[in-house]
A protein has these predicted regions:
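Long internal repeat-built scaffold domains in very large eukaryotic proteins
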Residues: 1-168, 185, 211-213, 217-222, ...
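Alpha-solenoid helical repeat scaffolds
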Residues: 30, 80-84, 121-385, 404, ...
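Residue-level signal for functionally critical sites in structured catalytic/ligand-binding pockets
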Residues: 302, 312, 346, 397, ...
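Extended amphipathic alpha-helical scaffold segments
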Residues: 382, 389-404, 408-426, 437-441, ...
Length: 809
């Protein structure tokens, strides 16, 4: 029967079918010592269905063989007055065939009698239940009363064995996973056996929960045991039972990629979640909380356990119950809200292990579960809501807790950024304020938190890989030259799109920041200029240092480099580590790396150049086996690189400031203002084009012109204060500015036009006198463009007071 390719296989199947139909197998129970036949019968049947892939042809054992064997074994169980414990062991062992730990053990140490695995199960990524598992499940379902009794006795024996010293136990110890328990070594071996039994219980609940009706009360008793190991194990087990999670483990976490493009929308999010295979799909045939209410209530009380490890385990499994909706059986609204409140309380636990476990649990939720489950009691700014308490953890006193919390909170916002940009409720009200909570941690004045915020900003909130810079070209049958032409034709458009897509993410972030967070955001951006100067000095010193090889002035060069390294190191939490890294980088003396860092900082570098340079720098450092250096170099590049104030972003920012797409105009205008005042160099590439736009849109006495010109004037005004020589000097441009000062419908536009004119014109006195004369001509309160002329006069009094005074006299 184990070899379907056998010439007599049809006859073998016929004999088995006849045996199952006639039930003559019951005769063996009347023999003396029937167990000597019954035990090999069960072993042989399970071996046959599990060893089918060993057939010479690779042909599978027929399904009717499995079916008839099940009927034969059920008949034996029904007719046997007493079932040998070995038979029960064989049956329940089949449920461990889907346990990755057992398969790993069998692969390393050879197959065990209680955990035989056929060759198609050698991988951990099983796709379906093995035949032996299905046979054992069918037997338990066909003989519920007998199997309930025998399985209860089986687990009772295991629990009794675990309650006495290891030297007095009399049952074989089977290999199992090493539990994460905190008790003594003497108890450890027995807890291992008990841990294996608890894994079996998880799978039996999924397969045939009826046989566990007498076992669950025993686990409930373990919840109140003195042993921490027992309480921990029982808490984990009941939590997984309620969540419908079997021995194969929980399903993989939903995708939460902050750099995914296009950004996923809430309405489509569930469609992006890959369906796990049947082994990992949570299934609870019955609602555990209703069938075993007493045990479930005892489990809920473990959130108050005196031992942190038990509370941490409780936080983990309660998250699974919420994620799986109690194994698919569903949670009542009040019950779900209660679990969310309890999980939120774990985020404020006095023990850091519990807080870390609760934060990690929240990190397992996908966008739809965050919105519809975790967000039921409010968003990041709702007092005492789960998301608000998670936001508190970004300032946790323990570094590993705040790091996890900040990354998870940032990832939530990043995945939801598309919906936040579109002002989609309830996503906006729940998660819009997440970046504000992260930037608020900046005020702790902790260098470690500052570095963490840098990482979160450029790796999660605004990841360098968002959006993908290179468009994936499909491999078609078209000629290579045609592809090249298409690529060249579409490349400018793709670059523009990349910049616009990224700018929309940046402006969405900026739009949602509160006033305190906004100040932090712009302080971080303004820091780029000072850091750029410092890093430039460092790179120049590295070049003089020449990897430690000198021709002259050795002491002076070393002293100069040491001074700069010390200055840069003070901005890191571990100054000694940062100093060592910067010295090592100088000794490596990779000139290409120096150039790459300069590319990332240069105001003339577009975003594509900055990202490529950053990635190449990271690759070069890793290839040279200097990966630890990135702990210092990455934050340094994030702080000095042109990652947000970037020249290729300017057209997209200007466009959004005019079109107000998705309500981003105000944020775009504020960004332009900050760029023009803090880092006007990035405007240099666009300033000539901006000035041409101003000329084209200039108002006249008969028309007010384009209102969107105000934003361009504001940006040019900031640029003119720092780099006036870069602006055009043509008379046509100055005439356009004069027209803005006199005829614009916006007083602000008039003010900015006067500022540009006074900063750039060689004959500004002449223009000032001319403007004053024209402003006061036929100028009475309430006259046409009264406020525009008033704004122009006030600005002239500030910037050209002598000429204004002369005319006023």
């Amino acid at each position: 029967l184990a070899d379907p390719s056998n010439a007599y296989n049809a006859q073998h199947i016929y004999v088995l079918g006849s045996l199952a139909e006639v039930k003559s197998v019951v005769l063996m129970v009347d023999l003396d010592h029937p167990d000597s036949l019954i035990v090999p019968l069960f072993t042989g049947c399970f071996d046959i269905v599990s060893g089918s892939s060993k057939a010479s042809t690779g042909e599978e054992v027929a399904k009717n063989v499995e079916f008839d064997m099940t009927r034969v074994l059920v008949t034996v169980i029904d007719e046997s007055p007493v079932l040998a414990p070995e038979v029960v062991d064989i049956i329940v062992a089949q449920f461990l065939r889907v346990d990755p730990r057992v398969m790993d053990t069998s692969n390393r140490k050879g197959k065990r009698p209680d955990a035989q695995v056929d060759s198609k199960q050698d991988t951990l990524l099983l796709k379906d239940y093995p035949a032996a598992y299905n046979m054992a499940k069918a037997i338990c379902q066909a003989c519920p009363e007998r199997m309930t009794s025998h399985i209860s006795q089986y687990f009772n024996n295991v629990i009794i064995d675990a309650s006495v010293p290891a030297g007095q136990t009399n049952g074989s110890k089977h290999g199992a996973r090493k539990p994460n328990l905190d008790d003594s070594d003497e108890e450890g071996e027995d807890i291992k056996e008990l841990s294996k039994a608890h894994r079996l219980i998880r799978e039996l609940w999924r397969a045939c929960p009826e046989v566990l009706q007498n076992v669950i009360p025993q686990i409930e008793a373990e919840l109140s045991a003195e042993s921490v190991s027992l309480r921990l194990l029982a808490t984990q087990t009941i939590g997984d039972l309620a969540a419908g999670i079997g021995v194969a483990g929980p399903p993989p976490s939903p995708p939460m990629d902050p750099a995914a493009y296009p950004p996923v929308a809430l309405v489509d999010y569930d469609n992006t979640i890959p369906q796990p295979n049947v082994l990992l799909t949570p299934v609870s045939p019955k609602p555990f909380s209703q069938v075993h209410n007493s045990a479930y209530e005892a489990f809920l009380s473990r959130r108050l356990d005196k031992t942190p490890s038990v509370r941490a385990a409780w936080a983990t499994v309660v998250g699974r119950i919420l994620l799986t909706s109690a194994g698919g059986s569903g949670l009542h609204e009040n019950e779900e809200q209660g679990l969310v409140r309890h999980l939120a309380s774990m985020l404020r636990d006095v023990d850091e292990k519990v807080r870390a476990a609760a934060v990690d649990t929240v990190g397992q939720f996908g966008l739809s579960q965050i919105v519809h489950k975790l967000g039921v009691d409010g968003g990041c700014s709702t007092p005492d809501s789960l998301l608000a308490i998670l936001a508190e953890r970004v300032k946790d006193r323990k570094p590993h807790v705040r790091e996890r919390a900040m990354k998870i909170l940032a990832r939530m916002w990043a995945v939801a950024a598309g919906d936040i940009e579109q002002n989609t409720e309830p996503v906006v009200s729940l998660l819009r304020d997440a970046p504000s909570k992260i930037f608020d941690a900046f005020y702790t004045n902790d260098q470690e938190i500052h570095v963490l915020i840098d990482r979160v900003l450029f790796e999660t909130l605004l990841p360098l890989s968002y959006p993908p810079i290179k468009a994936k070209l499909s491999r078609g049958n078209s000629s290579q030259s045609q592809k090249q032409k298409d690529s060249q034709a579409s490349e400018p458009e793709q670059e523009t799109d990349v910049d616009k897509i990224r700018v929309r993410r940046i402006l969405t972030l900026l739009r949602g920041l509160d006033e305190k967070a906004r100040r932090v955001f712009f302080v971080m951006l303004a820091r780029q200029l000072s850091m750029r100067s410092a890093v430039n000095l460092y790179l120049e010193a590295c070049e003089k240092y020449n990897g430690g090889v000198f021709d002259k002035d050795e002491e002076q060069i070393k002293a100069q480099l040491s001074k700069i390294v010390d200055s840069l190191s003070k901005t890191f939490p571990d100054a000694a580590r940062a100093s060592a890294d910067l010295w090592k980088f100088a000794k490596v003396h990779d000139r290409r790396s120096y150039q790459l860092i300069r590319f990332t900082m240069a105001a003339v570098s577009d975003y594509r150049t900055v990202v490529k340079a950053t990635r190449e720098l990271q690759r070069r450092v890793q290839t040279a086996n200097n990966s630890p250096l990135l702990e210092t170099l990455n934050p340094l590049v994030y702080r000095c690189g042109s990652l947000i104030f970037n020249r290729s972003h300017i057209p997209a920012i200007m466009s959004l400031s005019r079109t107000d797409e998705n309500g981003l105009a105000n944020a775009a205008q504020e960004m332009l203002k900050q760029i023009s005042s803090q880092n006007p160099e990035v405007l240099e590439a666009q300033v000539q084009e901006m000035c041409k736009d101003l000329e084209a849109q200039a108002p006249k006495a008969s028309s007010a012109g384009d209102t969107s010109a105000e934003d361009i004037l504001k940006a040019c005004s900031g640029f003119a204060k720092k780099l006036p020589a870069k602006l055009p000097k043509e008379r046509k441009f100055f005439q356009a500015l004069t027209n803005y000062a006199l005829y614009s419908s916006s007083p602000h536009a008039a003010k900015h036009a006067v500022s540009i004119l006074m900063a750039t014109a060689d004959k500004k006195e002449m223009y000032a006198k001319d403007l004053v004369q024209k402003c006061v001509k036929k100028w009475t309160y309430g006259s046409d463009r009264f406020l525009t002329r008033l704004a122009a006069l006030s600005q002239l009094n500030l910037l050209a007071p002598r000429e204004a005074d002369e005319e006023s006299d």
